[in-house]
């Protein structure tokens, strides 16, 4: 429930909905994460509350999960549309890191966690792959020259490895060589995949993406939530 203060942020002087406050907050975040998050070795730093990079100790590895670089690409593709200076550099570095560090050139797919020295966690997670698709779609929307390569690759991986047509949803997790790690299914990864599929449809107009998004919505909402008095189950098999 919104209070009066929140409502005033989200409305203009006439009381009509406004994006001005949201745009201001987005700009603050772009400025906060901007160049400070760029790791000179590749990928991105996590930042502390003051905006300084949280560099690991000398002996620690700089672990970078897949959803880190992919989210940076997505967010700074939006920043590019805002005209934010330096957004292209963030997108460049993110796409290069995803392709060169996270991508498994031998077995296909994308490792869950890596450092600049190699693979930390070789698992192939649906959650992370959903964000690869989102990053590729966002980069394509701003016409980045590396977007199509990533988009073509991740679409093939999702179609061949993750998608279960008989269920209308994604499998959850695999080993590096695509051995299933569990029978678990989750709403969270499928929710993020739905977002990414809609984004991919928006930039390609390929109805295959929209059809998959609708199938997930049918499973999670029309079947699971309906049978649970419209509560959305998080975990299922």
Q: Predicted regions: what is each one?
A:
Residues 1-237:
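Glycan-recognition and catalytic cores of secretory/periplasmic carbohydrate-active enzymes
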């Amino acid at each position: 429930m919104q209070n009066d203060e929140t409502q005033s942020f989200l409305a203009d002087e006439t009381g009509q909905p406004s994006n001005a406050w949201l745009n201001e907050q987005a700009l603050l975040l772009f400025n906060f994460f901007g160049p400070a998050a760029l790791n000179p070795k590749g990928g991105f730093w996590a930042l502390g509350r003051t905006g300084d990079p949280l560099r690991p100790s000398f002996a620690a590895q700089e672990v970078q999960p897949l959803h880190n670089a992919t989210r940076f690409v997505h967010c700074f593709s939006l920043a590019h549309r805002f005209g934010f200076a330096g957004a292209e550099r963030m997108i460049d570095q993110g796409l290069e890191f995803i392709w060169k560090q996270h991508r498994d050139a031998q077995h296909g797919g994308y490792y869950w966690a890596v450092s600049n020295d190699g693979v930390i966690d070789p698992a192939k997670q649906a959650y992370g792959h959903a964000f690869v698709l989102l990053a590729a779609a966002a980069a394509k929307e701003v016409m980045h020259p590396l977007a199509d390569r990533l988009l073509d690759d991740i679409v093939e991986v999702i179609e061949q490895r993750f998608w279960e047509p008989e269920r209308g949803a994604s499998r959850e997790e695999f080993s590096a060589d695509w051995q299933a790690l569990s029978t678990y299914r989750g709403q969270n990864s499928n929710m993020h995949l739905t977002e990414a599929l809609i984004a991919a449809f928006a930039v390609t107009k390929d109805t295959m993406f929209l059809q998959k998004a609708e199938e997930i919505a049918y499973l999670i909402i029309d079947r699971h939530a309906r049978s649970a008095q419209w509560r959305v189950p998080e975990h299922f098999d």
